[in-house]
Every structure is written in C-alpha cells, then in structure tokens.
C-alpha cells in the first residue's frame, strides 16, 4: 500500500539511484489521500520529541493548506472561516477541558 508524498520525493529517490514507482491520483483519490496524510502527520506530531515538533507541525500545516486548495479555499478564505468560528465559539487559549 502506498501513500501520498511531497512533490519532490520521486526526484529525490531518482537522485539516489533508485527508480520510484508512483502514479498521479485522480481528484477524489487525492482528497481521500490528503485526509489520510493529515492523520499520519498528526500522529507524527504527537509522537515527536520537543526538537522535532516544529517540523512535524509544519507538515500538518502543509497538508491542511493542500486540503484547503483541494476544496477551492485559499489561505485568506480559510483564515476568514477560522476567524468567524473563533468569534462564534472561541479559540483554545483558555485550555478548557470539558468533563
């Protein structure tokens, strides 16, 4: 079973002297693969050491941006939706844990 990888990974594999086997996903498969990738990157963030957390969080952000673009949202539109939700329901700054 394969997984979605960053755009330059096939070239990096080729540069190491190996031949990558890959395909370009159809639109629906791409959306599903992005969702799977988001869960993968979130798990990696959770499991990362303190030193690796920034890099893993950047990976999560990259997948979120790709998902937004896939849904037709640019960063500005996504920020607007997030701001609207924050104004209606708040953020997470107060660290409230509901029992």
Regions found by a protein language model. Name each.
Residues 1-99:
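Flexible "arm" and connector segments at domain edges
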